[in-house]
């Protein structure tokens, strides 16, 4: 999969809760289609009256080569509590260390950083908040027409 053809150099989203913007999520791509780096950042803050009730900061850097995840470094801070996830390719497996321990998995495997279309065909993902291997069921739903600026296109819902 070539993220540069799909997204260019980056994709960015505003995050809303109850109609109010509470943060942002941005994913940046650098390198070449066969060997690239993906940096994802998300910052959320839910304010109640005069204080912040919930604060979430997330940063991940993933190295991809020839369509496979080679490494992943994630740091997360939720309400001041920090955690990390580290994954490295070793002997045709990915070794993952997270807050609940270590695990190993054979590729293909996808982290939950929400950009790689290949994840729709998988049933296990790397939870980038915990490092756990989570079982998932991704169901194909209907298509819908979306408009972005002056462009209109069909999008597949899952």
Where are the regions a protein language model picked out?
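N-terminal export leaders
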Residues: 1-3
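N-terminal mature ectodomain segment of secretory-pathway/periplasmic proteins
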Residues: 7-11, 15-90
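Solvent-exposed helix/loop surface patches that form functional interfaces
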Residues: 8, 73-157
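Short hydrophobic alpha-helical segments that form membrane-spanning helices or hydrophobic packing faces
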Residues: 27, 157-158
